[in-house]
Amino acid sequence: LPDKAEARLALGLVPDKPTVFIFGGSLGARSINLAMEASVEKFRQAGIQVLWQTGKNYTPNSALNAENIKIMQFVDDMRTNYAAADVVVCRAGATTIAELAIIRKPAILVPFPQAANDHQ
């Protein structure tokens, strides 16, 4: 992975600020997006910057645009986003869990309630 500070600079973030990367996959995750909407102000007050990948089916309220929040519909470069993050909040998909394990990144995993045979 790239260096954390370099990754943050490349993403237009402050290099020495705590950073959370939040995503729900290419389509996004409604529950994650709604939780993020409700948390924007708390992140700002805590001095935490957020990389928020919403998915292509979600458009956040323009009032959620804050200097500490970078909103993206889709992420092409997961490596840089992973590198920039201190912690990741995401769906508990098998590929994502494998990626997080390989890079040893702390994560909060959100189960997908409609997963076939409860495979989460």
What are these regions (language model features)?
Residues 1, 52-53, 115:
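Short flexible/disordered coil segments
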Residues 1-2, 81-82, 118-120:
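Short, charged, surface-exposed secondary-structure boundary motifs
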Residues 2, 18, 111-113:
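Proline-rich low-complexity regions
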Residues 6, 11-90, 97:
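Donor-nucleotide binding loops and adjacent catalytic segments primarily
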Residues 74-77, 112-117:
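Short, acidic/turn-prone active-site loops that include or flank metal/cofactor-
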Residues 86-87, 104-112:
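Structural loop-to-beta junction motif characteristic of Rossmann-like glycosyltransferase folds
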Residues 88-94, 115-119:
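A general structural motif
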Residues 100:
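Donor-sugar nucleotide-binding helix/loop cap in glycosyltransferases
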